[in-house]
Amino acid sequence: MHNHKRKYHAISNGSGVIVANKDIRNGQANGVGNIGTSTVYFNTAFVKATSAQYADLAEMYQGDESYMPGTVVEFGGTQEITITTTESSPRIAGIVSTNPSYLMNSGLTALNSVPVALTGRVPCQVLGPVCKGDRLVSSMIPGVAQAFDASTYQPGCIIGKSLEDWTNATVKSIEVAVGRV
């Protein structure tokens, strides 16, 4: 292992944690880096990641309200996005993310700003029955998806594909691949 020195000092506590006063050093495999101290810290770190714990790419949007993760949202309302209320809405924005791997427009901190998954895997509220691989669209239930019905198709209405089966005619949170149509 090499500790590449730069102009600042880093100390290892022996457990793979690197405490850096102003710079990050190469640590041990799977190590955790604490940047700064309780009075000096960083707001942004530019890093190269080869893997991520979470599985979606999201973007911050200002909503009409603060929506729960798994809620299907569309462009419209008084702000940028609002909850879906119609079947097969062609204004789909995505699904409110639980904890995105990558977050665009992260500087948006306005009231009711939420991360909306644009692609990847996220939990989504769905009305069954839904089969694995089904294309999903918005339902009449606010913020809830359902299996695609070709008779109600409108361009732009597909949210993604179901990664799970749900056979009951009730609402449940399941994993969905967003943006895969």
Q: Which residue stretches match the model-derived regions?
A:
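Extracellular receptor-binding modules and their adjoining Ser/Thr/Gly/Asp/Asn-rich linkers
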Residues: 43-181
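Intrinsic low-complexity, repeat-rich intrinsically disordered segments enriched
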Residues: 1-65
